[in-house]
Amino acid sequence: METIVTGVLLGGTYALIAIGLTLQYGVARIMNLANGETFVAACFIAFWLFTSYAINPLWGILVIAPVAFLVNWAIYALLLRPLVDRAKSQGMLEVDSILATFGLLFLFQGLMLRGFGGAYTSYTFLAERFDIFGTFYGLNRVVAFGAACVIAVLLYLFLYRTRYGTAVRAVAVNPNSAKLVGIDVAKAAALSFALGGALTACGGTLLSTFYTFNASMGVIFTMKALIIVIMGGVGDVRGAVIAALILGIAETAVARLVDPGLTLAATYALFVFVLLFRPQGIFGRQQA
Amino acid sequence: MLRKVSMMVAVSAAAFVMATGIAAAQDTLKIGASAPKTGPLAGGAAVTHWPNIKLWVEEVNKRGGLKVGNKQMKVELIEYDDKTTADEAIKNITRLATVDKVDFIVTPYSTGINVATAPLIAKFGYPHITTSAATDSVPEFAKRWQNSFWLLGTSKQLAEGVADALKKLRDSGAIGKRVALVNVADAFGLELKNAGKPALEKAGFEIVYEASYPLGTQDVAPIISAAKAANPDAFVAFSYPPDTFALTEQAQIQKFDVGAFYVGVGTAFPAFAGRFKDNANGVMGVGGINASAPEMQDYLKRHKEVTGAVPDAWASATTYAGLEILGQAIERAGTTDKAKVIAEIRKGPFKTVIGEVNLKDGINHNVWAVGQWQDGTFNGVASSGLSGAKAPVKKQPWK
């Protein structure tokens, strides 16, 4: 029981890491390698708000998410739109966007180093005991899990229950056909990219309450997000959440019952397993 | 074509003559530093390494520079980021030696990169005073590279210190003999575990839980709950900063109360006490300083003034001491001749912030192994050959 709860909480953490990239990669078709840097930047801003102005990170989200939305919109409009416009094929856009965001990664990392230095940073927020079935869990992790659920549900409702969400999904499935039915593909893609950035920033803010981070750690989060996004099926939010939960529970079970040294092996074994039997991901669609 | 080439040769020859001409007349001492500003170890270097270089250079220049023979030479520092990779460090050091033509270099940061660059530094003939490398191969390395000096001790010393501190606690009746032992699965964690486990067993402890976890793990709830289930009297983790913090927070959350709680690198960081406040009290970790020694108190004060931050209570002071030794050796040699300075370093002894240091065989044998947070100071509680150790105290339950 304890293992399952710990695993589910960890899964929530992973979902927060991955959900933004799902939108950016799945809908906007941008493989954003600077995703982890956005994540860490949010950690730093949450830390700064908390230590300098005593702003609770949960309120901090209200500032950080809109800022991240605007910044990511600007990145898409200024940096990535030209790539999208000139790309002759999906493959070309993927290569170009990987190269561009790879550069962005170093820019962000450099800015964070300038601004916050290279040292490990952490703070204590809600590091209290929270009792579930007689075992103690960190309240900050429970809160992050709760927020992950809220974000996932809101996103689901937006994508599957609103008209605009349907348009966004149409773009994810086939950008060319979406144009034919009168969807403004460029705008939908920009919105998804910006929204993805905002969600990534939410994740960073929440994780900063229990993770120790520094300016060069972004790539760790990008890697984890990438695994989850591919396992879940590119562009499918439900898939990403389920993949995150599976990874969380599997890692915890292996760490608790077998050996903590094998958690990475478990992650990659699951990844290989999914790629072998469902290369399109858990919820992914077979490419026509 | 031929004329063009000979013209170029002439120009570069002229430039060369000019460059060497300037070098001969210089009154500045060029010192090069290559260490991580980015990459996995940037976090540690930002606390332990860079601030001490800054402090030393500023202080030396404030008092007019180093007295080399009959010249006062100010120090000019050239810094490069090695991105925490050995490849980059090797490029940087080659550049420092051949392009910047520095007179001396500051040690790189971390065991791995120091060992990887040691042959190159030996080839260029620079004194190599390592202050952040702790490995069991130190005696072998010190013999192999006669220009190298090792100040931070060996993994064995650090790990045996743990057994030593726990034994003191057991003898005083504070804890029993059950120990849970975990380590991060990289060279540092493995070496410490391989030395620590037999040392603990020899001291009569029983290992009731043992596990390792991958580098970078911060989700340590399962590790703490498994350790807790084994019902130990002491918890020992040979960990790195992010996991050191995570393990401590999880132990606190799960109310994992033991009489002795030891975590690895990062415990001695001021940020550790800053984050855990009262709960840091009684936590033991790698390192330690003799906080009551006057030269150490003076160092802590100056470090705070110049860099704006409190140093960590382990390798920071050692890093500073390494630079002090370099400076003193240059002044004693009265020349920037590298071989003569190396010979001077071997001669010793040096008065430093970590006390008197002798490097006859290239190794500093007197090091702190274990420290403990006691009312806001990280006091050394176990060492090899040093005096001033405080008695370890029993860890009180988490608040």
Q: Language-model features: where?
A:
Chain A
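Inter-helical junctions in multi-pass inner-membrane proteins, predominant
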Residues: 1-6, 10, 159-163, 192-229, ...
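Cytosolic-side transmembrane-helix boundaries in multi-pass membrane proteins
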Residues: 179-180, 184-187, 258-288
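Single transmembrane alpha-helix segments in multi-pass membrane proteins
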Residues: 1-51, 78, 84-90, 233-234
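Transmembrane helix-bundle core of multi-pass membrane transporters
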Residues: 83, 92-161, 188, 253, ...
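Pore- or pathway-lining transmembrane helices of multi-pass membrane proteins that form conduits
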Residues: 48, 84-112, 218-230, 260-275
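Alpha-helical transmembrane segments within multi-pass membrane transporters and channels
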Residues: 54-104, 242-247, 251, 278-279
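Helix-loop-helix "hairpin" substructures at the membrane interface of multi-pass membrane proteins
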Residues: 136-214, 237-243
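Membrane-interfacial amphipathic/re-entrant helices at transmembrane-helix boundaries
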Residues: 1-17, 45, 56-60, 87-96, ...
